[in-house]
Amino acid sequence: MLAEDNPGELWIEQGKTLFHQKRGPKSASLEQCNFGLGPGKLDGATTQLPRYFPDTDRVQDLESRLVTCMVQLQGFNHDDLVKRAISPAGSNGSDVEALALYITSRSNGMKMNVSLSHPKEQEMYKVGEYLFFRRSGQTDFACVQCHGAADKRIRLQDLIHMTSKQGVQEVVSTWPAYRGAHFVVRTMQWRLSDCFWQMRLPELKYASETSIALTTYLHYQGNGAVVKVPGFKR
């Protein structure tokens, strides 16, 4: 069951409208987009993402797959979509953010079940694991330094212990989430990008292989978590 009074629920309805609406230069909806279970089949689809897609010959997470469909089916420009995917704080949010929340909400109550059956999925997982533990950048920092033990915090913010099963499951099951400080829905791509910024690393390119690798590692580690979006974050 969703938490009461979560403003993020408004974005679910917005995303649903956008999904079924004919838009873009090709005046098409996203009803033929295949997120892994077949064209237009959304229930349970995000529980298995990231996954390998033969048509792109890539491992893709929800957001990169969504951009692929918006380009191929609707005719939107890839670079424009990527540029606008993460909305400014205090705005009404982006189409991609609303769509990502709606599609994920169709898996609410279902368990994460990410597979590593394809060699490219296995490779992506290994890269993500390496990145999670690798110290880098001007501060010589790694994800695990914030999220590798219990009872850590930055200022007043508790940090989730993501090398524990319970901790990583809490993360992967609650994004996209409504971010109270921004008054808008945020996605996993935003969460990773913001972490990179806080670690003073080079900007994380939206839907890049790096971001998908980290998501693959985290989502596989979180298998068994029950999806419950939108989450609510400070």
Model-identified regions with their sequence ranges:
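Electron-transfer interface patches adjacent to heme c in soluble/periplasmic c-type cytochromes
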Residues: 1-9, 21-32, 39-98, 108-109, ...
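Hydrophobic, well-structured mid-protein blocks that either form specific transmembrane helices
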Residues: 99-103, 115-116
